[in-house]
């Protein structure tokens, strides 16, 4: 299994380096170079870097892919598609998915809404110091606790109902109430939580 790190254009205050492949998304490419990390892929329209910075990225990247600013995908979506084309079994961690433009953050939170990325949703994790975002397809999902993290929240894509079992606050037919996001729940004694979703996907 290939472990891929994608460095996007949001805040990059906390990241790890134990990966096989490093991907820079637009200005994230420059961040990798400035931190003396490999730049295996550089992907984006590169509208957030100067001409000199772009030339440096072109020179240093093993694979350089420049897209038109007028495109259907965000730079991060485009980078993920290129990664899964080459490494279809990869486990991908995205750093810098938060803390920048809010429209980019929202796009990152709903990556499985792209039909090309939906088949890979279980292979994508968004991570920073305070957050770990994962995606689960409809059905019964077993959510494992994360070291150092107490709280867990659930959001269903679309209007599907969900149930929560094994958490501090369970949700089933006896106490069901409808919300877009069920936030600030907690793991009990570091035990897994089971969430069942009728359709769509779980964030």
Question: Model segments located where?
Answer:
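General beta-strand structural signal in soluble alpha/beta enzymes
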Residues: 23-25, 65-66, 125-128
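Short phosphate-binding loop-to-helix
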Residues: 64-87
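Short beta-strand segments
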Residues: 6-8, 26, 95-97, 127, ...
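Long, charged alpha-helical interface segments
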Residues: 129-131, 136-203
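Short coil/turn segments at beta-strand junctions that form active-site/ligand-binding loops
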Residues: 1-2, 20, 88-91, 122
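N-terminal beta-strand-loop-alpha-helix module at the start
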Residues: 1-56
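Short gly/pro/ser/thr-enriched loop/turn and capping motifs at secondary-structure boundaries
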Residues: 29-31, 49-51, 73, 101, ...
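Anionic-ligand-binding alpha/beta catalytic cores of soluble enzymes and soluble regulatory domains
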Residues: 91-139
């Amino acid at each position: 299994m290939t472990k891929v790190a994608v460095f996007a254009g949001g805040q990059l205050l906390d990241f790890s380096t134990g990966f096989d492949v490093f991907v820079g998304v637009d200005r994230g490419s420059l961040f990798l170079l400035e931190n003396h990390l490999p730049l295996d892929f550089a992907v984006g329209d590169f509208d957030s870097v100067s001409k000199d910075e772009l030339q440096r990225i072109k020179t240093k990247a093993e694979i350089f892919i420049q897209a038109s600013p007028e495109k259907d995908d965000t730079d991060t979506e485009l980078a993920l598609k290129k990664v899964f084309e080459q490494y279809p079994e990869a486990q991908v961690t995205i750093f810098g998915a938060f803390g920048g433009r809010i429209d980019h953050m929202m796009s990152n939170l709903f990556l499985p809404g792209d039909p090309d990325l939906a088949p890979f949703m279980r292979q994508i994790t968004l991570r920073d110091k305070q957050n770990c975002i994962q995606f689960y397809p409809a059905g019964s999902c077993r959510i494992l606790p994360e070291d150092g993290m107490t709280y867990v929240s659930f959001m269903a894509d679309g209007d599907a109902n969900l149930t929560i079992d094994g958490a501090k606050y369970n949700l089933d037919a006896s106490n069901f109430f409808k919300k877009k996001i069920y936030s600030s729940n907690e793991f009990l004694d570091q035990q897994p939580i089971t969430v069942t979703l009728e359709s769509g996907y779980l964030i």
